[in-house]
């Protein structure tokens, strides 16, 4: 679609000649997400329908205890340092963004009074600013008022390079100004049609200025409130034992009437996914269990217990293997996996190509994940029409052997291939979880047949996904040759998801390993495409840019990742629990509206 055709369609919607729904459906056919199409309509001033939630309770409280199981336990409760989903989910119990993404990919206001549109004056005609009106009467859990000063402070906090915030990429290229006590303006340096990033969803949780102002920059990790959150959410802090448990109680001053339904909340961490599933589906000890990364055959057997159900929600999450582009075994200036090094084996495209052929994705789907994981060749998988059609996966040990042989990697007396004094011996790490260990074993067995020796390393999940910068075994540090985990797609637009392979997001000592690119992949074409996509209005051109980015990182020539299975979000819940879950936000995004049918 050409730009003039797109503008013509937008004009027809504005003039009432084409319905909003018809426009969005047409954009979906072109491979655009519904939220992106919706933002286009907002940009030209077409009114949106408000998100409707089915919440039945007519008073606050009275629901007793809400019991949650996160088998990867939260270790920190500051959203700006939450590298792992578990810490983001834990933080979201207490902290809120200006807006979030509902299950259909629509924006809904949380701490904002309304979603900015052209119609209400929130979106500038030139596309270079967004004005947010804040909800009034909101209080922090300590009784202090929530104001524009808090919003501006969060931008200052996250954009300060010395803070090394996880979401610095969201905030460093914008400016935020206070208009009045309950209005802020986000300024872009160029027209930005897809503006819904800063202060939204996972990256948008807002911390209180009055408790963090003395802990900006290099002192940010010292703030006592990192472990004792004071937010605006429906539940307020009672106790936190990192790696074990969170306890909270209903916020009597919550800014939404009749919420929350539950009087108390306990999030129990640790254990494993199977025991978490059993505690909800079979014994009924808990109401909700997160991330059912369990063999599907086991889930079906546990569901027969009758206490709960497994729910699968569409999203964009991907289980994948990363190949380290740097040398994890050489230290430079006090840093392993330094950008000043190259991986001794994976710098050879032939070795990377061979590893791609040695991952039996279809077997992983068929024998491990079932309905909760679909074999894929793509990093970017959702929406379906957004997937690259240029890629395919293949499991072929003989072909891998042939590639290595032709590239000069010869088998030694021990059966391990080597070249120039470098042996194909790799450490392959992931978190402790039965499906992941089975996946590792499948890869190890195939690699052995190709003359590659793989040492399997399994790290406790709460350690592997820890936000503790002193921990050497976290996935952002990537002190191994290969690693596997699931990365979550936390918004329906692909921009934030695809920035994980931008060169400026490389995880390094300088940014306290908070960069979103642990593989340290650096590619000039990728960077240029990403920058161009940020200002591209034509949905077809923009989709093509993301598809090309996907093809670069998974491709034979320069690729450094091996997608394994696309993972819709699967969770277990009590049959009486009513919980809104979005594939585009944290599991705890709408916890204020959770309730039980009696």
Question: Model segments located where?
Answer:
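Protein kinase glycine-rich loop
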Residues: 70-119
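Extracytoplasmic/periplasmic ligand-capture domains
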Residues: 2-18, 22, 26, 50-61, ...
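N-terminal export signals
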Residues: 22-47
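General beta-strand recognition
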Residues: 67, 108, 131, 183-185, ...
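Surface-exposed binding/hinge segments that line
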Residues: 166-216, 239
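Short aromatic-enriched loop/helix-cap "lid" or pocket-rim segments at secondary-structure transitions
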Residues: 80-82, 198-200, 379-380, 469, ...
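Active-site-proximal polar cores
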Residues: 564
């Amino acid at each position: 679609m050409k730009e003039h055709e797109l503008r013509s369609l937008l004009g027809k919607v504005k003039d009432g000649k084409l319905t909003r729904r018809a426009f969005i459906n047409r954009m979906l056919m072109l491979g655009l997400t519904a939220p992106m199409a919706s933002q286009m309509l907002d940009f030209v001033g077409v009114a949106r329908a408000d998100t409707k939630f089915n919440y039945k309770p007519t008073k606050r409280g009275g629901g007793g205890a809400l019991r949650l199981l996160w088998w990867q336990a939260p270790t920190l409760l500051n959203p700006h340092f939450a590298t792992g989903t578990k810490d983001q989910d834990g933080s979201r119990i207490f902290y809120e963004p200006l807006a979030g993404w509902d299950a259909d990919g629509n924006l809904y206001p949380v701490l904002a009074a309304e979603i900015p549109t052209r119609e209400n004056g929130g979106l500038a005609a030139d596309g270079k600013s967004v004005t947010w009106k804040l909800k009034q009467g909101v209080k922090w859990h300590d009784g202090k008022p929530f104001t524009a000063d808090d919003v501006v402070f969060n931008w200052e906090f996250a954009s300060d390079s010395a803070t090394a915030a996880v979401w610095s990429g969201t905030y460093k290229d914008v400016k935020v100004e206070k208009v009045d006590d309950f209005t802020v303006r986000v300024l872009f340096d160029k027209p930005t049609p897809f503006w819904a990033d800063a202060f939204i969803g996972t990256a948008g949780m807002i911390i209180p200025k009055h408790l963090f102002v003395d802990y900006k920059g290099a002192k940010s990790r010292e703030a006592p409130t990192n472990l004792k959150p004071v937010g605006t959410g429906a539940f307020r802090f009672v106790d936190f034992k990192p790696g074990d448990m969170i306890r909270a109680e209903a916020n009597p001053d919550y800014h939404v009437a009749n919420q929350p339904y539950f009087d108390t909340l306990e999030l129990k961490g640790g254990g494993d996914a199977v025991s978490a599933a059993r505690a909800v589906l079979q014994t009924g000890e808990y109401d909700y269990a997160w991330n059912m990364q369990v063999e599907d055959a086991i889930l079906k057997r546990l569901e027969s217990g009758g206490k709960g159900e497994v729910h699968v929600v569409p999203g964009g999450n991907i289980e994948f293997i990363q190949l380290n582009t740097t040398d994890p075994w050489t230290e430079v200036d006090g840093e392993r996996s330094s950008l000043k090094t190259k991986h001794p084996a994976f710098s050879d495209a032939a070795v990377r190509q061979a590893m791609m052929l040695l991952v039996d994705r279809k077997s992983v789907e068929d024998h491990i994940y079932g309905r909760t994981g679909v074999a894929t060749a793509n990093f970017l998988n959702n929406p379906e029409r957004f997937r690259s059609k240029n890629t395919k996966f293949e499991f072929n040990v003989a072909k891998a052997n042939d590639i290595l042989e032709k590239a000069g990697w010869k088998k030694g007396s021990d059966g391990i291939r080597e070249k120039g004094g470098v042996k194909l011996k790799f450490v392959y790490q992931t978190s402790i979880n039965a499906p992941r260990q089975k996946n590792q074993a499948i890869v190890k067995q195939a690699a052995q047949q190709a003359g590659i020796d793989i040492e399997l390393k399994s790290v406790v999940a709460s350690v592997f996904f820890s936000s503790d910068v002193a921990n050497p075994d976290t996935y952002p540090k990537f002190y191994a040759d290969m690693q596997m985990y699931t990365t979550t797609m936390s918004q329906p637009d692909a921009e934030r998801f695809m920035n994980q392979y931008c060169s400026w997001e490389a995880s390094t000592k300088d940014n306290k390993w908070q960069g979103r690119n642990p593989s340290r992949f650096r590619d000039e074409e990728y960077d240029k495409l990403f920058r161009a996509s940020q200002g591209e209005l034509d949905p077809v051109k923009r989709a093509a840019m993301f598809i090309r980015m996907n093809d670069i990182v998974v491709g034979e020539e320069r690729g450094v990742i091996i997608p394994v299975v696309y993972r819709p979000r699967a969770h277990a819940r009590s049959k009486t629990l009513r919980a809104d879950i979005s594939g585009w936000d944290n599991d705890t995004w709408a916890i204020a509206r959770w309730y039980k049918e009696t």
